[in-house]
Amino acid sequence: MPAISLGLWHNFGDTTLIENSRQLLQRAFDLGITHFDLANNYGPPPGSAERNFGRILQEDFLPWRDELIISTKAGYTMWEGPYGDWGSRKYLLASLDQSLKRTGL
């Protein structure tokens, strides 16, 4: 893992203009940052940071995809019901699948 990464918590949700997020990612990459950290609940609203990152990745970063390290996390409440939060196997697998879909990976 690189010594420095860019966390995308409150600066990549739907409350932020996508162009601001795009410029931030481009500048970070130009400065040598190749690790981008996400989580299933990053936004706001939850999940929107992964979705917006995925959009920018597809539109701007595909030629450099092999240079990027993209991480995400699970364990935070995402939906109602017995499998909607924390660490059950079912929750973690469902969360992983949803994160992969949102990011387009």
Predicted features along the sequence, with ranges:
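N-terminal binding-site loop/beta-alpha segment at the start of enzyme catalytic domains
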Residues: 1-69
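Structural motif corresponding to the early beta-alpha repeats
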Residues: 60-87
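Generic beta-strand or strand-like secondary-structure segments
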Residues: 52-56, 69, 73, 91-98
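Glycine/proline-rich, positively charged
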Residues: 79-105
